[in-house]
UniProtKB/Swiss-Prot annotation:
This is ATP-dependent protease ATPase subunit HslU. ATP binds at I18, G60, V61, G62, K63, T64, E65, D256, E321, R393. It comes from the Bacteria. One of its GO terms (cellular component) is HslUV protease complex. Belongs to the ClpX chaperone family. HslU subfamily. Keywords: ATP-binding, Chaperone, Cytoplasm, Nucleotide-binding, Stress response. It is found in: Cytoplasm. A double ring-shaped homohexamer of HslV is capped on each side by a ring-shaped HslU homohexamer. The assembly of the HslU/HslV complex is dependent on binding of ATP. It comes from Salmonella arizonae (strain ATCC BAA-731 / CDC346-86 / RSK2980). One of its GO terms (molecular function) is peptidase activity. Pfam families: AAA, AAA_2. CDD domains: RecA-like_HslU (cd19498). Its main location: cytoplasm. Induction: By heat shock.
Amino acid sequence: MSEMTPREIVSELNKHIIGQDNAKRSVAIALRNRWRRMQLDEELRHEVTPKNILMIGPTGVGKTEIARRLAKLANAPFIKVEATKFTEVGYVGKEVDSIIRDLTDAAVKMVRVQAIEKNRYRAEELAEERILDVLVPPAKNNWGQTEQQQEPSAARQTFRKKLREGQLDDKEIEINLAAAPMGVEIMAPPGMEEMTSQLQSLFQNLGGQKQKPRKLKIKDAMKLLVEEEAAKLVNPEELKQDAIDAVEQHGIVFIDEIDKICKRGETSGPDVSREGVQRDLLPLVEGCTVSTKHGMVKTDHILFIASGAFQVAKPSDLIPELQGRLPIRVELQALTTSDFERILTEPNASVTVQYKALMATEGVNIEFTDSGIKRIAEAAWQVNETTENIGARRLHTVLERLMEEISYNASDLHGQNITIDAEYVSKHLDALVADEDLSRFIL
């Protein structure tokens, strides 16, 4: 898992997300506390539970982006889910236990990649030997059996040197590669994943591990052989256990749109996709054991981060027990004009940088001036105020409209320099921004 300090985590998040310092600090502290807990004695470590977070803020201010960037920094099993996709147990739809199953699947995939990477050097050696066996077949005795040679032959060493220098990359060889296992899809009701997994592995192993001859260039064969040899060096049982440990100790679940499962007013009949889902989430957040196809997973130390706009509902509309399981509340602020200006210029891959790079592929040089950036930010903020406030996402809409003419004619503008200043922006957007009805439908 990540050993970054809170300050380093915030610094990384600042490269992609503007403002929202309180939210960044909270997730940075929560992530660091995962590392701190692992440094404790076994007895005390079991008692330290994660402090789950509830992020509250209007749409388009960076809640989901914080989660997306956190996933890359965490170097731990991470999953982002939408609360609206689940229904109460016993009704048609996904049940909340599938969150932990999906998280475990993600952990297995992550641990497998790490294990393969760890064995890559040895796998490359084995793959090289298999290619050399095709290029320079080992000597055989009178009975057709391969003889064990103390020293590699001079020819083999010569080919090894050429292979490592890339001189044989384009040479075609025929080599035996493992055939893809027979895929069998089995639909099963929730909770029966363990049984379906066993049936699938049974069908896949019926024919054994078959080899299939394929004709490939050495460069392509090398990649496939390295993957095949690395997979052979990985112990599946160890891999599963490591993945389960990673989920239990370092797993992070991000639940988006949690405000959409709040109960609004008095309703009659069962509320299977709102309050029912909240009740089902309780044991997961509090700590329980979930059965997955890889084994039993305890959720006691998984970190849960929930987020929602809470424009119609309020955090107090969540059932009290769930409110108590989300002790850290972070409020994200609505974005201002100056925030929009920073969003257009400061992030590593800001929208303006993306448009400049896209147009450069057609030989068109786009230049955004400070006055142009300011006018774009003002236009986006103005439309947000007069219509629906969708936060930073409005910048995409405004910029797409602004760049439409250039994008359409880019192939005819090869070699030209185009400056986007306040005058250019006003010419293309003022009429739309001023007319509220047009803004509502076009921007």
